[in-house]
Amino acid sequence: MNEHNGSRFAHITKAHPCFNEKMHDKVGRAHVPVAPKCNIYCNFCTRNINDEENRPGVTSCIMKPDDAISHVDDVTAEGPISVVGVAGPGDSLANEETFEFFEKLGKTHPDLIKCMSTNGLLLPKYADRLAELGVNSVTVTINAIDPDIAMDI
């Protein structure tokens, strides 16, 4: 089942560039920075807003959900994209704006794959809500499996 044939996730694993390296240069995608707050403070993470850096936790601006929808409108007008993701700069689930954005995106662009990343701490609380909003893919960052190491981080 190498190609995920028969899987209910086959469409996503074939089309989403995070799960299929062959799609990296073929699938247009947009990441929108609508989630500035985080629910943990990791020693290695410095959230920042600037135009100079390109790394996790840094963005050139924070978008309000309506601005993010306008951005997706603009990007889809320029060329085809199939994926829109919320990836910070904080934790997606620690921000009500994430849910507002996905609700609006579902109404304006229902065919796009909706994805997000999270540290997962709030996932049990919000998993049903994400499903109701049509979020197709959730990436959970795992920084440690040993609780002692996690405390150091």
Question: Positions of the model-derived regions?
Answer:
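Canonical Radical SAM [4Fe-4S] cluster-binding loop centered on the CxxxCxxC motif
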Residues: H4-F9, C18-M63
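Conserved Radical SAM active-site core
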Residues: R47-V140, A144-M151
